[in-house]
Amino acid sequence: MKKCSVILAAVMAAALCAPAVSQIAAQAAEDAPVVGFWSTEEGVTERPIADGTTETYAESDRKWQGLPTIAVTPGGRMWCAWQTGDAIEGSEGPNNYDVMYYSDDNGKTWSNEYMIWDVPDDSVRLADPRLFYDQFGKLWLVLIRGGLKGAYAVEMKNPDCEDPARNLETGEPISWMKAPPAHRPTILSNGYWITPVEVDTDAQQTYICRPDNDAGKYPWTTTTSQPAVTAYPDNKTFGEAQIVELSDGSLMMLSRLPRDCGGGMEISYSYDYGTSWTPYKADNGVPYISPSSKFHIQRLESGAILMITHATTADREQLAAYLSYDDGKTYPYMLMLDDTDIRGSWRDFGVSYPEAAAQQGENGEIYIVYDAGRYGLKEIRMCVVTEEDIKAGKPVTQYCRMREQISKLGGYLDYVDTSEDYERYITVQPGTEKSAILAQLPASVTLIGEDGSQLPLTGEWECLDYAKNIEGRYTFEFSGKVTGKAQDLYSLLKVYVTVAAEKEEPSDPSDPSDPGTPEKPSDPADQKDNGWIIGVSVGGAAIVLCALVAAVIVIRKKHSASRKK
């Protein structure tokens, strides 16, 4: 049985009970390029998969999720879509599809009704959805069909409607372009749309659209006078490029570089609205120090350029937001969005593939979505920040919200405690050897899950940049490999060491009012810590420990998945 037939049967059944199916013209056609329908966890649809068996679209059958996109409607509703499925995303295989949820409370909770987009052909998949508002006020959902097989677009005609599962109207999927875009199009000041695409695994090309809204035509054409085709080096097969318009009307295009090219990004400029481009020039300076991962760049309402990328070349961690007020020449402001450490398996992918909504909130809020641990944590997360937060380098406004869950799949436990008694904050005198610090830390750590289960780990503590004679704060991390199983694992397995000259020995360590008691370290991860140990001497070196007395360190889960009823 074809997948389309199975889907249509489920759609007919769903029409008899809540939620009703949206008015999607394409789902009635056997040859539809994509089909869409609404579902819930209580009424999921079976689907055939490549090995001849069946599964459902339920969250419990999804093996991974990632690559989110977000848009905010004029009425304030948020729509968020991402790719998921049963197949391993990295294999570019079939059986992956797109899902779309909505929120009516500024992203605090998300609907338990969701929209499924899939393809009738079992041999291909849907990938990398993109939500895109054009200058005419139309909201588009762009769906990439099967790797390099092109893209389709669906217009969401009334995205602010009441009860979307019953009342959302969508247009028939139209062929968007023959090559897949990695980002939503950039709308230029002349009204044109422009996007870089992957022509094949060896080259990139620029597509330009001059939309005719009155005629309902949105033709994409490649540049003709000087085709903007860039031949990739031998060890670069794709770039996921994105374009931003500068204040003088010129265009800046950025493209990711693989690690064996040195990491970072390539930069090219156009001075004729994308008809021709300068040769790419590599840059791995801040903020272009990418670990070969997708980034996001856009111009904000203030005119500033927002860049979201990683603050390291080492791995897909330390996701940060940067601001430039001089057209990308410098980025003096940075806010760390998510420094979750999800190492241990390359398939965890860290925190990656960010996107910011093109629409800002009424208070200047910037809505940023990304994935966290595609195969371990299996989370879609959101940060809400303002320019003031980014310029301050920390949350300073009442609107700032960090690392919130939009969706989390099951399959792994959240580990919230550790049974070992070790100090998380240590202050040492300059000259203290690393070995004196390591001697105080356990060689094994047992993690405790929310259900009481235990996971013993054996490993070593390490800090590669520790310099005993240089004052500052250093992070020691436990090397026991856990493949992204815990949202707060990165906090549980870190010790923060401050090298600082001791000014004065406390006269009474047990008296918290004594002026000699060191101030408790200010760290968001330690907000629930209680208790102190002062004045411990190890190996002849004076080490002042500021840490927990309790035998169990408790870092509670910061967010739990929430579904709007």
What is the meaning of each model-derived region?
Residues 9-19:
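Bacterial N-terminal signal peptides
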Residues 17-30, 531-532, 551-558:
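Sec-dependent signal peptide cleavage junction
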Residues 30-410:
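Asp-box/BNR beta-propeller blade signature and adjacent active/binding-site loops
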Residues 407-453:
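Solvent-exposed, low-complexity, repeat-rich "mucin-like" stalks and linkers
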Residues 451-499:
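Serine/threonine-rich, repeat-prone extracellular segments and beta-strand-based repeat modules
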Residues 533-544:
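Single-pass type I membrane protein transmembrane segment
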Residues 545-565:
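C-terminal membrane-anchoring or membrane-association module
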